Amino acid sequence: AANNLVPSNAPRIEFAVSAIKNSSNHHSLYAVRTNSNLLSMHVSHDDGATWTQFVGASGPPSEFDIFRDQGTYNSIVTVTPNNTNKILIGGIDVWQWEQTSNNPPSGGFEQISFWALSPTSSKYVHADNHEMKWDALNRLYVGNDGGVNVTDDYGANWFPANRGYNVTQFYGIAFDKDGAVMGGAQDNGTLYNDHTLSTFKEFREV
């Protein structure tokens, strides 16, 4: 049913706003509510004045599973630049939803990236997606635990965009008075630098 608010009783809520106006001359807004898994998805086609839930916690068929118990860790949503009725949702993998009917809004989901495939596959995107940004040429950049992936055809094909940098995500860091530093990293173990390696920038796993 339509209402004026997206329920706030969720550990995490991600919002997205369309870059263009829809056929009613309003911006479309989307909200994805999660705990460890999907709670609900909501849409507004009138600049946020009213909202309609189009997916509940039970979700679509059982093969649909975006978050796989990680909904508070990885969740992101974006509206495609040229279609206010189509969104991409990032969790473990990237999924697409497109509205196909109105009153109430309803549509279908399609998985458009696959973490389980070989990294050489054009459908491969690393797991745990955290950020999505479009550029002026409608290329989508997705930031995840493996770095950055990009698509220039709305998810039909994906390419790695990791060039010339070494990064990791730290959850905790400690250091001593002499400048030695240790950190616990996502998927990269515990890294330590006591300035005894060939450069001061080098860390070793301990």
Q: Whereabouts are the PLM-identified features?
A:
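Beta-propeller blade termini and top-face loops
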Residues: 1-206
